[in-house]
Amino acid sequence: MSIEIANESGIDVPEEDLVSVARFVIGRMDVHPAAELSMVLVDLDTMADLHMRWMDLPGPTDVMSFPMDELEPGGRPDSPEPGPSMLGDIVLCPEFAADQAHKAGHSLEHELALLTVHGVLHLLGYDHAEPEEEKEMFALQARLLEEWYESLREARRRAELAERDARLLGKAGFTAPGDALGPA
């Protein structure tokens, strides 16, 4: 899976987290592993221009999605596997997101992760124009975001356990994996 990110916003953000959450959601939604995604982080003026140009709405917004290929999440188990495709572009505005994060009482990093999930879901055809669609999309968005956070916690826990095990084995005279087997 190829995920390109370009930060043109002038704001330092954890790009690796945005790639991580996008990759997680794409995987959870059964999108072909060779799919491609582009993410661009822009300033307020650029986002306002895009918002007016594509949505005919004044002022900036937090996230916009521009799908490329028609994709459906999941699919039938007996259907032929689709080939790689270009999901599309997600445009994020960190400055706008920072204001939203402050109002919501959480971090910019959390807001950008949430907006990335939101953007990927739009690329996959989810929308929130109607109340029922909004309910479905926002529930899925919340579930995927929580699952991503849980996967990070689990990875951190596994790394801590591996480090602890290596320390204990080292104290007992055993070498690290990849070294000669048996006691040192």
UniProtKB/Swiss-Prot annotation:
- Give the record's GO CC terms: cytoplasm
Write down the InterPro entries for this protein, in alphabetical order.
MetalPrtase_cat_dom_sf_prd, YbeY, YbeY_CS
Location of this chain's protein in the cell: Cytoplasm
> Which cofactor names does the annotation list?
Zn(2+)
Give the main localization category: cytoplasm
Q: What is this protein called?
A: Endoribonuclease YbeY
The keyword Zinc belongs to this UniProt entry's keyword annotation: yes
Q: What broad class of enzyme is this?
A: hydrolase
Which species is the source of this protein?
Answer: Nocardia farcinica (strain IFM 10152)
